[in-house]
Design a protein with these regions (language model features):
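Bacterial N-terminal signal peptides
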Residues: 14-27, 31
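Bacterial N-terminal signal peptides that target proteins for export
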Residues: 2-19
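Intrinsically disordered, low-complexity segments enriched in small/polar residues
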Residues: 5, 19-20, 51, 256
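N-terminal amphipathic/basic-hydrophobic helices that include classical n-h-c signal peptides
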Residues: 1-4, 26, 33
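Residues at the start of alpha-helices and the adjacent loop-to-helix junctions
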Residues: 9-13, 26, 49, 85
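Flexible loop/hinge segments at secondary-structure junctions
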Residues: 33-267
Length: 267
């Protein structure tokens, strides 16, 4: 199941990058995941009296909800600690750690070799990379759109100018088989900006590392993509499944035309 899903772009691992000191100050987060099996050798977390100061997170917008949850839980134990979460994009995570502007750098992709090298040059050791969760990336349309599924070559043909998956350009809904009001309407496409790990993951998995079309309306965050698609019945965009609302519909995805499509789910 996992290998099939990976082949159609859906699953990606999320990471939390930090310095060694940052890891120690946030270690109790494992106890928040009661439903997940925890290493029995992990010592029980003990509250440290008198802890104060600030914890700042800079990085993936896709992980904002998780970071806000974790920092709020941390503040329940430490009333004197201030927390701040900035979802600027995964590419901002490592520079913020290196510059001392953040304690944690959430990333919705693997750290790049040059990012790890820059960190090691600064501190003399590699960053601590903690796999935290699995995210599912989905392709969305307006909730009233009759389209139910789409193939990966079609996704590439809509979002990419280079179309490395071999399809012809798709610019109108009629090319996807829709009739009536949709047939001659252009597909308004929405996505993330280059600072986002979601942008890079979609580029790799959905576009075969091809180039995005200039017509993609780049949004600053996952929520903004969903809002844009939900407000335009001729729109299509990509975002994490955790940001899905009643205003949009996540399309079933097929590796190729004519092959079974897999329905994205947050279960």
């Amino acid at each position: 199941m996992t290998s099939t899903m990976s082949a159609i772009l859906t699953l990606r691992q999320l990471f939390l990058a930090t310095t060694i000191g940052g890891l120690l100050s946030f270690a109790f987060q494992s106890n928040l995941l009661a439903e997940v099996t925890i290493d029995p050798a992990l010592p029980t977390y003990k509250v440290v009296p008198g802890l104060s100061g600030q914890i700042k997170s800079v990085g993936s917008d896709s992980m904002n909800s998780l970071m806000l949850l974790w920092t709020e839980k941390f503040k329940e134990k430490y009333k004197g600690v201030r927390t701040e979460v900035e979802g600027q994009g995964s590419s901002k995570a490592m520079p913020a750690l290196i510059e001392g502007a953040a304690s944690f750098g959430p990333m919705s992709r693997d750290a790049k070799p040059n990012e790890i090298a820059d960190f090691e040059k600064k501190f003399g050791y590699k960053p601590v990379l903690l796999p935290t969760s699995i995210d599912l990336l989905a392709v969305y349309v307006h909730r009233d759109n009759p389209l139910e599924s789409i193939s990966m070559p079609e996704v590439d043909a809509i979002f990419s100018s280079t179309r490395k998956l071999g399809g012809e350009p798709i610019e109108r809904w009629g090319q996807l088989g829709l009739k009536g009001d949709y047939e001659n309407e252009a597909v308004a496409i929405f996505g993330r900006n280059a600072a986002s790990g979601t942008y890079g993951y979609f580029k790799e998995k959905a576009l075969g590392n091809g180039d995005f079309r200039d017509q993609v309306n780049e949004q600053p965050g996952s929520t903004a993509v969903i809002q844009s698609v939900g407000e335009n019945r001729f729109a299509m965009g990509y975002s994490g499944i955790g940001y899905k609302t009643s205003a949009v519909k996540a399309l079933k995805l097929a590796p190729k035309a004519g092959e079974p499509a897999i329905e994205p789910t947050d279960a």
